[in-house]
Swiss-Prot record:
Zn(2+) binds at C224, C294, C301, C304. SUPFAM superfamilies: beta and beta-prime subunits of DNA dependent RNA-polymerase (SSF64484). In plastids the minimal PEP RNA polymerase catalytic core is composed of four subunits: alpha, beta, beta', and beta''. When a (nuclear-encoded) sigma factor is associated with the core the holoenzyme is formed, which can initiate transcription. It comes from Nymphaea alba. DNA-dependent RNA polymerase catalyzes the transcription of DNA into RNA using the four ribonucleoside triphosphates as substrates. GO terms for cellular component: chloroplast; DNA-directed RNA polymerase complex; mitochondrion. Its main location: plastid. InterPro entries: DNA-dir_RpoC2_beta_pp, RNA_pol_beta''_euk, RNA_pol_Rpb1_3_sf, RNA_pol_Rpb1_4, RNA_pol_Rpb1_5, Rpb1_funnel_sf. Its EC number is 2.7.7.6. It catalyses: RNA(n) + a ribonucleoside 5'-triphosphate = RNA(n+1) + diphosphate. This is DNA-directed RNA polymerase subunit beta''. One of its GO terms (biological process) is DNA-templated transcription.
Amino acid sequence: MEVLMAERADLVFHNKVIDGTAMKRLISRLIDHFGIAYTSHILDQVKTLGFQQATATSISLGIDDLLTTPSKRWLVQDAEQQSLILEKHHHYGNVHAVEKLRQSIEIWYATSEYLRQEMNLNFKMTDPSNPVHIMSYSGARGNASQVHQLVGMRGLMSDPQGQMIDLPIQSNLREGLSLTEYTISCYGARKGVVDTAVRTSDAGYLTRRLVEVVQHIVVRRTDCGSTRGISVSFRKGMTERIFIQTLIGRVLANDVYLGLRCIATRNQDIGIGLVNRFMTSRAQPIYIRTPFTCRSASWICRLCYGRSPTHGDLVELGEAVGIIAGQSIGEPGTQLTLRTFHTGGVFTGGTAEHVRAPSNGKIKFNEDLVHPTRTRHGHPAFLCYVDLYVTIESQDIIHSVNIPPKSFLLVQNDQYVESEQVIAEIRAGTSTFHFKERVRKHIYSDSEGEMHWSTGVYHAPEYTHGNVHFLPKTSHLWILSGGPCKSSLVPFSLHKDQDQMNVQSLSVQERSISDFSVNNNRVKHKLFGSDPLARKGRRISDYAAGSERVISNGDGDFIYPAILRENSYLLAKRRRNRFIIPFQYDPEWEKELTPHSSTSITVEIPANGILRRNSILAYFDDPRYRRSSSGITKYGIIEVDSIVKKEGLVEYRRPKESRPKYQMKVDRFFVIPEEVHILPGSSSIMVRNNSIIGVDTRITFNTRSQIGGLVRIEKKKKIELKIFSGGIHFPGETDKISRHIGILIPPGARKKMDKGSKGKNWEGNNWVYVQRITPIKKKYFVSVRPVVTYEIADGINLVTLFPGDMLQEKDNLRLQVVNYILYGDGKPIRGISHTSIQLVRTCLVLNWDQDKKGSIEKVQASSAEVRANDLIRYFIRIDLVKSPILYTGKRNDRSGSVIPDTGSYCANTNLFSSKVKIKSLSQHQGTVRTFLNRNKEGQSLIVFSSSNCSRINVSKYHNVTKESIKEKEDTPIPILNLLGPLGTVPKIHNFSPSYHSITHNEILLNKYLILDNKNPKQTFQLLKYYLVDENGRISNANPCSDIIFNLFGSCFLPHDYCEGTSTTRIISLGQFICENVCLSKHGTRIKSGQVIMVYLDSFIIRSAKPYLATRGATVHGDYGEIFYEGDTLVTFIYEKSRSGDITHGLPKVEQVLEVRSIDSISMNLEKRVEGWNEHITGILGIPWGFLIGAELTIAQSRVSLVNKIQKVYRSQGVQIHNKHIEIIVRQITSKVLVSEDGMSNVFSPGELIGLLRAERAGRALEEAICYRAVLLGITRASLNTQSFISEASFQETARVLAKAALRGRIDWLKGLKENVVLGGMIPVGTGFKRFVHRSREYNNIPLEIQKKNFFGGEMRDILFHHRELFCSCIPKPKSFHNTSEQPFYAMGSNPIVHKSGFIIS
């Protein structure tokens, strides 16, 4: 102290801020210099001084101290601009999702970091004494990153899985967060209290397991006599700090020489002075003793452990170093989980170094040495394999830059670069221990549509029938817009591929309809009329030819809400022996209908397409005759006693006729409404028979009446309860009315009624129904009920339906209009809730003239489609068939077609299937494309609507060559025909070489189908659906047909022929066009998509969304499969460095320690271990091979495990001494697994034994023991100790104890835990002396007596579980420690060099 006072004049005065780390260094140097007691005295004074100053300053924190950096606004704007450009590139399909994610994260991370630096500068310049600024640097409260979140921006957050959310939080906490930002910030992992709680318990459990593994490790010897060491040399890339940390407090394993002079001796501990000498001299590698090199198995010696971190001198005997080690690793975890802030673990694959241009100029390099590639961000670049010399020529000087191999060159040859422009990116060194993990990123579909792959990519699924494909190269996946009608099987007869239909949004509740082929052989196609109000003011876009069908079936019991649609006409054209009905709409109907009604004409075509005479072709349900409530139908006026004769016309009898239809000649009929409740026989009814109730009276426990009136109850099997609305009349004796049980009274007949009758029910101008009710004999009263009257109009006659046809040649087919009432006279109508009941149906009955030659009983009906003037019209075609029908194919075969004898072929007769689910079509108008379902039972449809298509006009005639080119004289080559839309190819049986088709351009084009001369009878297959590739190939999706029909090769001229015609690009059908591509001189911007129709002056694009997928990505689903919104399209597997963040670090530490990690760390170790085991034994022979193989693998894996765990903690600025980690790692790597190959009698195969024990046993026995090194996790290691009491108190108590009992294990109570459990004294600290004393006495007993005791006791353990016993049974009086002093390596003491720079000697 006096010395200090005397020298005070010479002391240096430091005017410097001391932060936490400087304080730590100061304290450690004080301890080194003065010792602990004196240091604590000094620190006490510092503490007092600190508190005095803090009180005097009295720093407080107000909200005004939180100053936002002014430059924040333009920094954020700049980042947003970059993100926008990136988003565009992603939209155009230039960058895939992972690249976008990486880049946006780096953009925002850079912005955030830059803002953080700006924040410090800003504080220093504007307000250096700002309390926020002072606190963040003193370490008193928060750190720079936390303050940055208060006044800068919060930046990027992780989601709970540790993935970055690429939407940054731009606000800071001072400005306040928006709702979205708040949600994300809650998401940001560990933000929540919950997360902290969970992680804390995780950290606690980690500590528990760590302590469990190493609790028995105590310092028991001064020197174990080990001659091995681990080499430490000052490598490139190693910071001084790490070098010092590694060496200080260790003990040297060998002498260290500088030249010939020995500067340090073996077993000397290394202090700061010695380290400085090592660093200045940079001597040869220094060998130090570590817990790894200690020769003992279940304890450790003082010299291998080194200095105690607390006192700074060699560790004391009896110190429980294991528990200290476990706690030192676990405790930072507990602490760090409470740090809830996180700046964002960034996806940098190791930060890349950039090479910048030295001056302006033109850049030149040898293009043969580079090849094009993509950078991590999806930018185009060149990868160079060897050193590349790049020259930059400016006006007067040539600069030469050397670019190392495996770098990315970011500029092109001969490009002009500016000074300081980045021209290359050097990849970060791969040797660094980066926590790389392979991450799967799923890309989901944004819209529903059809999957499409680009050309030139061969996609083979991994398994034969799998639908998971790996991409061999980078390519685009397209989702062509349009979704299926959401049904498994929709049998559409009339929709063809590429038809355009008009779908207003309709929601039909899904009903599963049973197989209707049993009771009714018909399917009904509903053609729906439209709502007149909806059409006004609506423009139909020019290519949207509308016609729309929804299929219903059954007997009309299901009545679906009609689809309202634009043009649905029904119009007849009569031709010779053929009758064509186009589906159109007559505007005359609008006037007849009430505004809210919806008309629907349902055309019935039987499933086999054959109609008989007098069968109903179509029917029309007039909405005026629709009821939703129950009632009774009555015809005629009973009061006048003129009951109209009704003829029951049972029409078209079938095996199971569902109900007769009544053809009527009356002009009106009546429905008497009543409310009917059919109740189970056991139900309790709360109203009496013949009583009068009001509206909403409770009838049973859970039903209420909807109308008021008289209650009638009939009891049969079930109780039928009817409520008659209306009034009650008690007649006098003179009333005429009493004779009738039930009559209808017209409005004029009221006055004749009895004037004395009470009640107001008689008044009014409506018909009433009078019914006599006799509740008991001779007492009766009359119920008067209102009646709903329906007038039957003349209905729709044929003239209104079918405008006259000019070209009537033979009127040999007739249609009659017939009205049918669906319910007989007096029949009750039962309404089901929420459905409407059709009372009258207007039907079209088909009839035809008798032919003189004979009667024709059947006609053939099919649907046809004609396109003209941009409109597609659909017709029902009815052919008279004179001869019996030939059935081809099976009866129920969907593809079986009907071929008449006469040779006229009728297409697509049987496209129905019997199971139907109708679901909602909610789209606007669109085109239909049929495709086959996976289960091959029926067709489904894709509807893509006009909102998904765009029409582009391009300059005229640039895609048509004027003349046909002739190659050979005879072969007709087709005129270039890109005009027609894609239509399906019909089956052509009597094949003619040219056929006509009506296209959109009102011109008939001859398409010549060229046939091979070798194969004249080429069959054409009806494609169920096909997809067009970019180069015009058509893939046939029907696996059953083996005929591949190349439509484009035969119909269209390939566009390679049009060489000199025009400079603008040829647009071919089926070509994919990315957004932003210029297609004509006017530079129209278009959306991305596939060309589906090409006209002379324009073409139509079906919009599609491109997704870029890189090589090795997994594509889910097959070509042409339908994807819904949110389905997984592609899975990318990419590497990212893990976020260097402790709570994501903890799981990492745990994964390393448990050796079960999902990422590549321990997998590599496991593989390495196996590889070593094989090679070494092959080289060195069995006993040495096993020993050295195990030793080397263990040494290797130990070093890499220690490094990986250290990396996590260092990334958080937590310093843990290597010794602690080494003790843990030593425990999880010290076991070997006995393998089956050697049949030794001592250990059973699959047993885990310590490596040292295996060595000794191998040396003692004549035969070799085969074993290999294994990495145990900490849990497994704690369940494989020498003490079963310790194991049982950890996990699986019953199992451990049962096994121990069966094996007769002995617990020698050497660890701490066993003694605590049994209440003994623990063998550490002061209790250690007694333990050592006891074991020494035991060692001195002569061997013979030991043997007697051993075999005299009840010892059944043949496996000798305890090493000391085992050693003492071998007849060698020497102690094992002496034998182990000789090096046991076959190669002497030559050090073995290991890749990572550590040398194992």
